């Protein structure tokens, strides 16, 4: 058998593995169920791709994101590794053809969304698939106590029952200890077998700034640290505004969010990857699956609601091992927003049922109907028609997803599809009477295999190049061919979609597991609380603090985060700093305390050290000293 290293060299042209990769691969090759926790950019996909290539058969990769699947398949095919993907952008005919190819062709990887596991078509082909490994990407999605629970992941357990002798490799970049255990349990590991790479990023400097004028600080950071940058914002509107403000400072910047067309997103992403654009200002729709090693700064203009998201997003900086910076900006309003989030993210059951009822009315779905159907969903029109708050609707939809009632895909991209629906004899006659449509028809027949048997994906831009016509002319002719009954034509679609997983129920009888719902809310409150502490009262090394959240107690002070640098400057150990800080907080009453009185209470501590801590707390706006010399806690 070819060694793992030789396989890596042959296809990836690397001479060595990254930390933990080889151990994980060997575990998989030994047939062991394995959980791998590797940081963003740590090479998770290599851990299942290498062993799958070394063994006979097909690796089944379960992944939640269509864009990631497409990227992985494209990258594998570029390496001459045959791979396929089945996702919601395919027609029934295309899914059937893909699964048939997986059975009869010499393919090594089949990427599948978890929703597809329970379809009759997949179940029909499953016994014929020679599966050598089940790889579960974004494995934290299986835990309802995690930050991104997706119910379809629970169906993977049924797959394990069907394939009891096939090992599973679960990979994730961020899972706290309780979620790690949940992954092991839900995926029915035969033995607990977990590989954890340290959550420490020794080249990444974390900093937090409480500041009123975020935009000025943002520009200051970009001017201070040259190179490629990502700026994360919470709202689509803000991404455009901030990109424009950055551009005014003669810094190349663009914006990116899920509301843009697929073509626009691809163009903006490529311009940033090629360094044509220096700064990309984006929502969290950006970044998944993008491997750009030379990002020097990741700046959060808004505070994320949990450490998992922050760690993943910040971790996109400095993948080349050189010094990089993760900067988080916040103000008093951000703190209030975070504190209010648990009640917003977990709406009252009455409100959830109201949104469900309104959704059924909007989509015109009668009681007892709808299971398995996909519906176009314009959320802006919906909230306007039913006078609902858009944040309530988004959060109610998330709850309905987690309860297994529906799925909401905001980033849907369905390519155009076409199929000839007349016989070849009639087609020949038609060509004679409609010569103006001949070029497009011949292009379809020559370019798209299977187009006479059923709907297949077509690419209108490709047709424009081959026929030397404009995109408008091609679309018009395709519509004309449909009107004349020659083809069935489904234009490209980027409208968000709702998929009902069950028949519509009367709203008053809609089942929501209240005990689990409350427990998920409590878990979320703990995540927000940890994030708030990171912002407002973290006096230990930030790298150490982040790592402790994920259960990694081995990390030492990084010496490069804002907290470490500040404590270095005041020549205090962490223990000394915390001791002085504690006395200060305990001494200051609600009415405040004169500075002289505070220094008396710090008797026995060197005055310069005491003042250094006071000055630090003042600069961090945790305390304030008024004109009378009275110290108060802010």
Regions found by a protein language model. Name each.
Residues 294-295, 299, 303-312, 318-627:
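C-terminal accessory region of SF2 helicases/translocases
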């Amino acid at each position: 058998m070819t060694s793992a290293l030789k396989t890596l060299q042959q296809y990836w042209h690397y001479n060595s593995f990254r930390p933990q990769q080889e151990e994980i691969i060997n575990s998989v090759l030994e047939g062991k169920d394995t959980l791998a926790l590797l940081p963003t950019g740590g090479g998770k996909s290599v851990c299942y791709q290498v062993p799958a290539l070394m063994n006979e058969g097909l690796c089944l990769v379960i992944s939640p994101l269509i864009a990631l699947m497409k990227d992985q398949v494209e990258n594998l095919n570029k390496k001459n590794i045959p791979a396929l993907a089945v996702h919601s952008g395919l027609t029934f005919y295309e899914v059937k053809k893909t699964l048939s190819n997986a059975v009869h062709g010499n393919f090594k990887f089949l990427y599948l969304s978890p929703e597809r596991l329970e379809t009759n078509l997949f179940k029909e082909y499953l016994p014929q698939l020679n599966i050598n490994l089940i790889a579960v990407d974004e494995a934290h999605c299986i835990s309802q106590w995690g930050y991104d629970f997706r119910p379809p992941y629970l169906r993977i357990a049924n797959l394990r029952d069907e394939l009891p002798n096939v090992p599973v490799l679960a990979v994730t970049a961020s899972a706290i200890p309780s979620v790690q255990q949940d992954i092991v349990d839900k995926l029915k590991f035969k033995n607990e077998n977990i590989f954890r790479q340290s959550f420490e990023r020794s080249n990444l400097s974390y900093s937090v700034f409480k500041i009123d004028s975020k935009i000025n600080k943002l520009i200051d950071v970009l001017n201070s640290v040259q190179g490629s940058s990502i700026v994360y914002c919470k709202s689509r509107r803000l991404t455009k505004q901030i990109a424009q403000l950055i551009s005014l400072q003669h810094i190349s910047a663009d914006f990116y969010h899920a509301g843009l067309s697929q073509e626009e997103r691809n163009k903006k992403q490529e311009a940033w990857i090629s360094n044509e654009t220096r700064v990309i200002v984006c929502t969290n729709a950006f970044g998944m699956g993008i491997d750009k090693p030379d990002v020097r700064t990741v700046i959060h203009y808004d505070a994320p609601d949990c450490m998992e998201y922050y760690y993943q997003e910040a971790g996109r900086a400095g993948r080349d091992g050189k010094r990089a910076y993760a900067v988080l900006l916040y103000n008093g309003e951000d703190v209030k927003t975070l504190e209010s989030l648990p009640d917003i993210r977990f709406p009252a059951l009455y409100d959830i049922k109201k949104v469900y009822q309104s959704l059924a009315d909007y989509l015109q779905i009668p009681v007892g109907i709808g299971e398995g159907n996909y519906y176009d969903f314009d959320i802006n029109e919906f909230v306007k028609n039913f006078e609902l708050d858009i944040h309530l609707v988004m959060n109610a939809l998330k709850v309905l997803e987690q309860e297994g009632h529906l799925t909401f895909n905001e980033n849907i991209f369905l390519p155009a599809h076409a199929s000839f629906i007349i016989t070849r004899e009639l087609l020949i006659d038609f060509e004679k009477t409609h010569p103006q449509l001949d070029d497009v028809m011949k292009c379809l027949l020559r370019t798209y295999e299977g187009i006479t048997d059923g709907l297949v994906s077509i690419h209108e831009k490709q047709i424009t190049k081959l026929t030397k016509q404009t995109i408008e002319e091609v679309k018009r002719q395709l519509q004309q061919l449909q009107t004349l009954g020659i083809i069935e034509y489904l234009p490209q679609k980027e409208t968000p979609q709702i998929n009902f997983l069950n028949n519509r129920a009367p709203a008053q009888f809609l089942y929501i597991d209240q005990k689990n719902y409350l427990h998920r809310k409590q878990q979320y409150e703990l995540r927000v609380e940890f994030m708030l502490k990171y912002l407002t009262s973290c006096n230990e090394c930030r790298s150490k603090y982040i790592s402790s959240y994920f259960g990694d107690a081995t990390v030492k002070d990084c010496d490069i985060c804002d907290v470490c640098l500040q404590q270095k400057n005041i020549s205090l150990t962490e223990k000394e700093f915390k001791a002085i800080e504690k006395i200060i907080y305990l001494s200051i009453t609600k009415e405040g305390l004169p500075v002289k009185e505070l220094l008396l209470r710090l008797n026995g501590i060197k005055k310069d050290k005491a003042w250094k801590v006071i000055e630090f707390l003042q600069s961090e706006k945790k305390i304030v000293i008024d004109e009378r010399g009275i110290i108060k806690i802010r």
